[in-house]
Regions:
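Surface-exposed, charge/polar-rich loops and edge strands
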Residues: 147, 180-182, 190, 196-197, ...
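A short aromatic-anchored loop/beta-hairpin motif
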Residues: 25-156
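Short, glycine/serine-rich, charged loops/turns that create anion-binding
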Residues: 68-69, 101, 189, 217-222
């Protein structure tokens, strides 16, 4: 087994163990019961949300910490995500780049209506594997994304690829009606400069009412999660990395953010693998002025991991 494949295998094993540990602690009497309660008011509110028009100007690009099935049992976090979405006009479509579709050629998920979901987690109650998110056809967005890519870098259409949990879990909370077309774009590299370039190509879509999302987690040291963290403790490595990122984002210091391997405290514990951090460079690249301060929309911790999320204009 080559080194890259072995790392991917070991990472998948860590994720599986971490999901099982989460499931053992986040074990509500009614799985996703908090989500059901959330829907009792969120659906009506969503129906009143105003849809984006050209007069609104470009939508922001956003980076969100996406969570996993326990998000559906975390009422405060759902309220934060939903409140964020409601503070913006309803997008005409969503294009999302998730930490969980990496090391792939530049590709788009299935664009047909009722896109299937990828249940890329293990050890949770059956309810989470029965959830659906039946979004409208995103074919028009797929064609538009392809049109902004250079001829030398074609976009592949992966007609059988559904939305992974880095996409559908937060979006099911943010847009619970499922009435916004959603398309997922793969993350073909971890290189910040290349991801910034990819984000720049997506920038025109924001002016057309498309919400561009980078989906990851501000700290994601799953191999180092302890029983104490599952019960609310926050380790120094997570706090320190989060404070460093918050400061750099507040200054619009993209160069510092891109130098996280050497400059960020709390490394490599906060990101032993970097796929949950680097989607932010899609977000920053899609910004009109990446060097402007970002606006933090969500902060705090889940399982000791920073769920900091932000938007840029």
């Amino acid at each position: 087994m080559v080194a890259a494949d072995r790392l991917k295998y070991l990472t998948s094993q860590v994720l599986e163990r971490s999901f099982k540990a989460m499931a053992s602690v986040f074990d509500p009497q009614v799985p996703a019961g908090a989500f059901d309660a959330f829907l009792s008011t969120a659906l009506a509110t969503s129906r009143e949300q105003r849809t984006w028009t050209p007069d609104d100007g470009a939508l922001p690009s956003i980076y969100l910490s996406h969570g996993a099935p326990p998000l559906f049992d975390d009422a405060p976090w759902m309220d934060q995500l939903f409140g964020w979405s409601q503070a913006l006009p309803k997008p005409k479509a969503v294009l999302i780049v998730s930490a969980h579709w990496e090391s792939a050629p530049l590709s788009l998920s299935a664009s047909a209506a009722n896109t299937p979901l990828v249940y890329d987690f293990g050890g949770f109650a059956k309810r989470y594997y029965e959830m659906t998110y039946r979004t409208p056809d995103a074919g028009e967005l797929a064609r538009r994304v392809a049109s902004v890519m250079p001829d030398t870098e074609p976009v592949h259409q992966h007609v059988s690829r559904g939305l992974d949990h880095g996409a559908w879990v937060p979006l099911k909370v943010m847009y619970p009606l499922g009435d916004v077309p959603v398309l997922q774009l793969s993350m073909p590299t971890h290189d910040p400069a290349k991801l910034m370039d990819l984000g720049r190509r997506l920038r025109p879509l924001r002016e057309e009412g498309v919400l561009v999302i980078g989906s990851g987690f501000m700290t994601h040291g799953l191999p180092f999660v302890t029983r104490e963290m599952l019960h609310g403790a926050v380790p120094a490595w997570s706090k320190d990395f989060d404070a460093w990122a918050s400061d750099a984002l507040g200054r619009g210091d993209v160069d510092t953010l891109a130098s996280y391997r050497s400059k960020a405290p709390g490394m490599p514990y906060s990101h032993p693998t970097v796929e949950h951090y680097v989607p932010m460079f899609i977000t920053l690249g899609a910004a009109k002025h990446p060097e402007q301060p970002a606006t933090t929309t969500i902060e705090g911790y889940m399982m000791g991991l920073s769920k900091r999320s932000f938007q840029v204009d």
